[in-house]
Amino acid sequence: IANICQAIPDTNIDDIAATIGLDPRIGNLFLNAGPGYGGSCLPKDMNAIINLSSKIGVKPTLLNAVKKTNRLQISNIMTLIKHNIGKIQGKKITILGVAFKPNTDDVRDSMGIELVRKLVKLGANVTIHDPKALDNTRKIFHGNAKYTTTISSALKNCQCAIIMTQWKEYEKINNKTIKYMNKKFIIDSRRILSNKNLNAKYYAIGLGQKI
C-alpha cells in the first residue's frame, strides 16, 4: 500500500494506516511502512514457518509473497537512487541508520545493511552514520565503507542520502544540515522529514510527490 501511495501525488501512507488502525481488530501498532522488516526474530521466524510448511506439504503462498515483497523494498530504493544520480560507481552515498530499529546496536538482517551491501558491490563510496551500530557495522564491511559519528560529516559532499533507521537524531536534519551536500537528494524511508521544507529533492517511502 505504501508503494501505491508513493505513486499517487499528495498521498501519505500514514493517513491510510491511521484509518486502517481505527479498526480494533487490526490496531495500528505495526502499521509502519518503511524499507522492510529485519532484526533477529521476524525474518528467522518467517523462514522457519515457510520451511515447516514446505516439509508438511502445505504451500506457503502468502508467506512467500510477504518475504518477496519485503526484499523488493530495497530494490525500489536502489531504483530511486539510480534514476536520480545515474551510475552508482564512484558516487558518494550516505546511509543514515543501519540498526534494524532505533535504540539498539543490532544490525542482524537489517535493511540498512542490505542496502550498503548492494551499494558497495556496485562501487559506491558509502559513508555510514548510526548513533549506536557503527562498531557492529565495521565488523561486516571493514574498510569497504566509511564511518562517521556526526550527521554533518556524513552528509558533506554526498550525492545522495538515505534515511534507513528512525533515530530521533535524524528529526533534527534541516537546510543548514544539508547545506554541504554535493547534490541535495534525500530518500527518507521513514518519512521523518516529511513535514520539513527542505531545499532538496526529497522522496519518502509511502509519500506521493506534491503537486
Regions found by a protein language model. Name each.
Residues 2-211:
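Structural/interface elements that position substrates and couple domains in central-metabolism enzymes
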